[in-house]
Swiss-Prot record:
Membrane topology: Multi-pass membrane protein
Protein name: Photosystem I assembly protein Ycf4
Naturally occurring in which organism (per UniProt): Vitis vinifera (Grape)
Keyword match Membrane: yes
BP terms from Gene Ontology: photosynthesis
GO cellular component: chloroplast thylakoid membrane; photosystem I
Localization terms from the record: Plastid, Chloroplast thylakoid membrane
InterPro entries per the UniProt record, alphabetical: PSI_Ycf4_assembly
């Protein structure tokens, strides 16, 4: 989502509160809870889950392994729920032509660097760059960067943002026009 006027462009960044993260955290929680209950029921010798009789799964080694997977899954699920509740990765990009300042803000993990805030001068922006990256499945992903003098490139889009090449090109062209800088493609 973005908001634009003649002088200011504000781009809101979603972060970790996406539908897919909610689904994965919920599925992982239920699955790991099931594994832990099956492992515990095999240890106790009682049916805590009515799907499997506890006599079919002996505690050593199947019950121990299922309990371990259940505990590990609960830890990973709690990590996902924490990132969702802290909204890690969300924030905004603000481009202010009137003041000549670019502000990039992101929420991080709790601690000393929870708030990540970058303030840059517009005159230091060299270009808007579109780079092609390949993920582990050999898919090509387009990522939008802002090239800054003396500081390198700052990513403006996430790698999981599924924009078509036309949409990415349109976004880069509009931003480059707004900032009055050239576009580079790598």
């Amino acid at each position: 989502m973005s908001w634009r006027s003649e002088r200011i462009w504000i781009e809101l960044i979603t972060g970790s509160r996406k539908t897919s993260n909610f689904c994965w955290a919920f599925i992982l929680f239920l699955g790991s809870l099931g594994f832990l209950l099956v492992g515990t029921s095999s240890y106790l010798g009682r049916n805590l889950i009515s799907l499997f009789p506890s006599q079919q799964i002996i505690f050593f080694p199947q019950g121990i392994v299922m309990s371990f997977y259940g505990i590990a899954g609960l830890f990973i699920s709690s990590y996902l729920w924490c990132t969702i509740s802290w909204n890690v990765g969300s924030g905004y990009d603000r481009f202010d032509r009137k003041e000549g300042i670019v502000c990039i803000f992101r929420w991080g993990f709790p601690g000393k660097n929870r708030r990540i805030f970058l303030r840059l001068l517009m005159k230091d922006i060299q270009s808007i760059r579109i780079a092609v990256k390949e993920d582990i499945y050999a898919r090509r992903i387009l990522v939008l960067y802002m090239e800054i003098r003396g500081q390198g490139a700052i990513p403006l889009t996430r790698t999981d943002e599924n924009l078509t090449p036309r949409e990415m090109e349109q976004k880069a062209a509009e931003l480059a026009y707004f900032l009055r800088v050239p576009i580079e493609v790598f």
